[in-house]
Amino acid sequence: MSDEERTLVLLKPDAVKRRLMGEIIGRYEAKGLTVRAMELSTIDTKIARKHYAEHVGRDYYAALEEFITSGPLVAMVLEGRRAISVVRAMNGTTDCAEALPGTIRGDFGTEKNHNLVHASDCLESAEREIGLWFPHLV
């Protein structure tokens, strides 16, 4: 069984606004991951609700939706050895205040709700998310 995986990563509007795209993508590439697809776009609430379907209805969802639709983001598919766990480790914990130095959120994050990046959490999520953002890849 191969340990090559694909994962979806979003560089959220705060990463784009703060001009951190090159720095973040460079970190992924330096770790040996390959960008297989990438697109800059501003999403609407329909896509946000599909992407974050498991969060719709929770107390924090309205703020999440407002943030993720507030400006352009970068959606990309990264591929490589154990890509899902590698990317999640590189990103750091969701709450930037708790993220370790050396992680993307630990080095650049400013708050829990504006935490720069999203990454698929498992193979099933990766396939679902890649299908939503890049249907031609599934």
Curated annotation (Swiss-Prot):
Gene Ontology process terms (BP): CTP biosynthetic process; GTP biosynthetic process; UTP biosynthetic process
GO cellular component, one term: cytoplasm
Entry keyword set: ATP-binding, Cytoplasm, Kinase, Magnesium, Metal-binding, Nucleotide metabolism, Nucleotide-binding, Phosphoprotein, Transferase
Chief localisation class: cytoplasm
Pfam families named among the record's database cross-references: NDK (PF00334)
Subcellular location: Cytoplasm
Record-listed E.C. numbers: 2.7.4.6
Catalytic residues (UniProt): 118
Domain of life (superkingdom): Bacteria
Coiled-coil residues: none
Cofactor list: Mg(2+)
Keyword Metal-binding: yes
Catalyzed chemical reaction(s): a 2'-deoxyribonucleoside 5'-diphosphate + ATP = a 2'-deoxyribonucleoside 5'-triphosphate + ADP; a ribonucleoside 5'-diphosphate + ATP = a ribonucleoside 5'-triphosphate + ADP
Binding sites annotated in the UniProt record for ATP: 12, 60, 88, 94, 105, 115
PROSITE patterns per UniProt: NDPK_LIKE
Molecular functions (GO terms): ATP binding; metal ion binding; nucleoside diphosphate kinase activity
Role: Major role in the synthesis of nucleoside triphosphates other than ATP. The ATP gamma phosphate is transferred to the NDP beta phosphate via a ping-pong mechanism, using a phosphorylated active-site intermediate.
Subunit text: Homotetramer.
Family as reported in the entry's similarity comment: Belongs to the NDK family.
Name the UniProt record assigns to this protein: Nucleoside diphosphate kinase
Native organism taxonomy: Bacteria, Bacillati, Actinomycetota, Actinomycetes, Propionibacteriales
